[in-house]
Amino acid sequence: MQFSSYEDLRPRLLAGEVSCEEVVRVYLERIERHGDDNIYLTVFRDEAIERAAALDRKLREGGEPGRLFGLPMAIKDNISMDGAPLTCASKMLEGYRSVYDATVIRRLFDEDAIFLGKTNMDEFAMGSSNENSAFGPVQNPFDPSRVPGGSSGGSAAAVAAGLCMVALGSDTGGSVRQPAGFCDVVGLKPTYGRISRYGLVAFASSFDQIGVLSHSSMDAALVLGVMAGSDPHDATSSSHAVSDYCSEVSGVSVKGLKIGVPKEFFNEGLNPDVSRVVLARLEELRLQGAELVDITLPKSDHAIAAYYVLVTAEASSNLARYDGARYGYRSAGATDLSSMYVESRTEGFGPEVKRRIMLGTYVLSSGYYDTYYKKAQQVRRVFQDRYREALSRVDVIAGPTSPFPPFGIGAKTADPLEMYLADVFTVPASIVGMPALSVPVGYDGENLPVGMHLICNFFEEGKLLGIARHMQRPVSRLNPAL
């Protein structure tokens, strides 16, 4: 039997044509074969088989199956699961085990999802290539010599390689969407506050959102519907009503759809192949009845400058808790309290994390706060107003997910600024807090994936996923059906 999505698998599970345990064992066998790709940091082999057997028994005994009954999922290793390792791909947390479940984990578990393991990532979610992991880089399933994107590179690669059906990631400035584009899968960042952050290890608290990676928009809609909603444990979670996302996805039509195309997203710095693929797909949609509307979003390049001021400032504050005193790595060479703090952080954090802590401390320091941090917050408000105005005239804003295709491992590590520019098209949606996603639309001249980036207005996730469903090319040439 062939199952390319949970939308296809679920009815077969409920009909008894295939069991949860059979499905889980297939995925676990694949994970074992792909061990050299460094995609998973932890695999819950025994727990997943036991969980699958329990769900099969529940169905046989007439129990009511949950909305995600038997869905094999992977979890990014910065999301807490009670009793499971929680490393954030950092030496600082190596060996640490979480003592509670994140809200999203509890909600998914209650709807009968099955967790296969925890995926690799950039350390503390800081990076765009998955090369910053203390446990080594993840290989892109399309070309092992290339990066999968980051920071949720392990989650994106797991979905692309068929090592899970759906994965959770986190997105601060593009960390779900950019690797989704590099790995030919759908990657959704919801509206800020749509999903509880309780149990997500903080990088930049006013930006961080848990996101979904999947092969289909409908699978993402289903998982989003389970996770979304207010949470008393997270004061920033929204009480905005949770829609029936699956119905909204089905109700979107291409005919009459107004697609805003910013000229700033198609400048001379864009890879020609990426531009060609994205524009060709937009033209195909125009021929199907959509309207392409030229829009302008001036000073778009200022978004990434403001973003790196704000997120490094927040990271500097959030990561102050890792001091070697309460949990995590403690230097063996410390001789007093002060040296314990300094040496534990020096040895426990990787180069990129230390770089961002130093930048954040600088922009928050006396004499520079107004010049950098306050100014960046003002720029953030300007972008919120510009995007709100643009989306009052169009249904969706479309452009490339990344300015270039997946690049070689090690190709950009010597130039942090060039690496930061990998997020130039994804950062604006994070600055404004609007929902955005990457959807596969084709391949470049080297047969590498190209993603299209879509942004909708606040809390329009159903509409966004419905538009993506029309834009998406057929299932990835790589995806191994079950």
UniProtKB/Swiss-Prot annotation:
Subunit structure: Heterotrimer of A, B and C subunits.
Function description: Allows the formation of correctly charged Gln-tRNA(Gln) through the transamidation of misacylated Glu-tRNA(Gln) in organisms which lack glutaminyl-tRNA synthetase. The reaction takes place in the presence of glutamine and ATP through an activated gamma-phospho-Glu-tRNA(Gln).
Active site, UniProt feature: K76 (charge relay system), S151 (charge relay system), S175 (acyl-ester intermediate)
Record protein name field: Glutamyl-tRNA(Gln) amidotransferase subunit A
UniProt-listed HAMAP family: GatA
Source organism of this protein record: Chlorobium phaeovibrioides (strain DSM 265 / 1930)
Domain of life assignment: Bacteria
Reactions catalysed according to its record: L-glutamyl-tRNA(Gln) + L-glutamine + ATP + H2O = L-glutaminyl-tRNA(Gln) + L-glutamate + ADP + phosphate + H(+)
Record's GO cellular component terms: glutamyl-tRNA(Gln) amidotransferase complex
Keywords assigned: ATP-binding, Ligase, Nucleotide-binding, Protein biosynthesis
Presence of keyword tRNA-binding: no
UniProt record, GO biological process: translation
Keyword Nucleotide-binding: yes
E.C. code: 6.3.5.7
Family classification: Belongs to the amidase family. GatA subfamily.
InterPro entries in alphabetical order: Amidase (IPR000120), Amidase_CS (IPR020556), Amidase_dom (IPR023631), AS_sf (IPR036928), GatA (IPR004412)
Record GO terms (molecular function): ATP binding; glutaminyl-tRNA synthase (glutamine-hydrolyzing) activity
